[in-house]
C-alpha cells in the first residue's frame, strides 16, 4: 500500500496534532520522573556521599533534556537518562568508575533491589512503566568542551576483563544544544544552566509551545515503536531519529511552524530512500 503524505491535507494536519497531544507524558508521569531523578541525584551528591570529594555533576541527557519523550507504547517503558560526572582523569579504569557509582547506589536499601547492570550505565527499574539510567562519566580532556568519557564494559562487573573495557567519548550536552538550535522557536528559550552540582530536568513544555521539530521527533519515535513492535532489537535508537530530524531541519530552505509540513518533508524523503535502499529496515 502506497503511503503518500500531502502537506496541504488539512485532515492530516488535524490528525497529527491530535496524535502529538496524545504522545505527551501525563502530568503524573512527568512529575514521577522528575521526583525520582531529584532523589537519586541527591543520594549520589549529598553530604556524606563518598562521591562528594570528586565534585559530582549530575545532569539529564537524551529525550527528557530536549523535550521529546513520548508516552509508553504497548508494554514499553518511558525513561530518564542521566549522567553522573566525577572529577577524575582517564587514568581511572572504566570499571573502577562504574563500581564507585554502583557501590554508592547499592548502599541505599531503596535502590539496591532496583539496580541492573548495563554496559554503559546503571539502570534503576521502578515499579510500573519507568526506569532511570545513570551513566558514570569523567571529563574528556582530549576533546574538551562538554565532551565526556563513559565506561563501555564488555564483561560482567564481578568478572572484569580490563583488556576489554574502554572509554567511549560522547557529548550529550553538545548534542542537546545542537538540536535546540535546529528548532524553529515558538518563543525564545535560551536558558543556560549554571555549573551546579545537580542540573534540574528542563521544565515540561506545553504542547502548543513545543517547537515543530520536537513534535516531529515524537511522531517519528511513535512510528518507530509501531513499525518495530515485533522486532524491537532492530528499532533505530532515539538518538539516530533525533539527529536525522535535526539535520533535515537544518537543511530546509524555509522554516515552518507546522508539524505536518515539516514531518511530511522529512518522512517523504526518507520513505523514498527506503524504497530504493531499504535503509529504514
Predicted regions and their residues:
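Short N-terminal edge-element motif at the start of the domain
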Residues: 50-52, 57, 95-103, 200-209, ...
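Extended, alpha-helix-rich binding/interface surfaces that flank or overlap catalytic cores
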Residues: 70, 135-207
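Glycine-rich, often proline-containing surface loops adjacent to acidic residues and nearby aromatics
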Residues: 16, 76-85, 192-203, 221, ...
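Short beta-strand-to-loop capping motifs
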Residues: 84-88, 249-252
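Extracellular/secreted glycoprotein ectodomains characterized by long, lumenal stretches
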Residues: 72-74, 85-90, 102, 142
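Conserved nucleotidyltransferase catalytic core and NTase-mimicking acidic/glycine-rich helix/loop elements
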Residues: 204-281
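Conserved catalytic core of two-metal-ion nucleotidyltransferases
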Residues: 44-48, 66, 98-156
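N-terminal regions immediately upstream of nucleotidyltransferase
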Residues: 1-77, 89-96, 121-124
Amino acid at each position: 500500500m502506497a503511503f503518500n503524505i500531502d502537506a496541504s491535507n488539512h485532515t492530516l494536519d488535524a490528525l497529527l496534532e491530535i496524535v502529538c497531544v496524545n504522545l505527551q507524558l501525563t502530568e503524573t508521569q512527568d512529575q514521577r520522573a522528575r521526583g525520582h531523578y531529584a532523589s537519586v541525584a541527591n543520594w549520589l551528591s549529598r553530604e556524606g556521599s563518598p562521591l562528594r570529594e570528586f565534585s559530582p555533576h549530575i545532569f539529564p541527557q537524551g529525550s527528557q533534556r530536549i523535550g521529546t519523550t513520548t508516552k509508553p507504547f504497548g508494554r514499553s517503558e518511558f525513561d530518564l537518562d542521566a549522567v553522573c560526572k566525577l572529577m577524575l582523569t582517564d587514568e581511572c579504569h572504566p570499571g573502577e568508575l562504574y563500581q564507585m557509582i554502583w557501590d554508592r547506589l547499592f548502599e541505599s536499601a531503596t535502590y539496591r533491589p532496583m539496580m541492573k547492570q548495563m554496559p554503559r550505565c546503571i539502570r534503576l527499574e521502578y515499579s510500573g512503566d519507568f526506569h532511570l539510567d545513570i551513566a558514570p562519566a569523567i571529563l574528556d580532556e582530549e576533546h574538551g568542551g562538554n565532551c565526556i568519557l563513559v565506561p563501555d564494559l564488555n564483561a560482567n562487573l564481578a568478572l572484569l576483563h580490563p583488556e576489554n573495557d574502554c572509554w567511549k567519548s560522547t557529548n550529550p550536552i553538545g548534542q542537546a544544544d545542537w538540536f535546540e538550535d535546529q528548532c524553529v522557536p515558538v518563543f525564545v528559550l535560551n536558558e543556560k544552566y549554571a555549573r551546579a552540582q545537580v542540573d534540574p530536568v528542563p521544565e515540561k513544555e506545553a504542547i502548543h509551545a513545543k517547537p515543530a521539530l520536537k513534535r516531529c521527533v515524537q511522531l517519528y519515535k511513535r512510528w518507530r515503536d509501531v513499525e518495530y513492535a515485533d522486532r524491537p532489537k532492530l528499532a533505530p535508537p532515539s538518538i539516530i531519529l533525533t539527529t536525522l530530524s535535526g539535520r533535515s531541519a537544518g537543511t530546509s530552505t524555509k522554516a515552518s511552524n507546522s508539524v505536518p509540513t515539516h514531518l511530511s518533508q522529512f518522512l517523504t524523503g526518507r520513505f523514498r530512500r527506503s524504497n530504493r535502499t531499504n535503509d529504514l529496515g
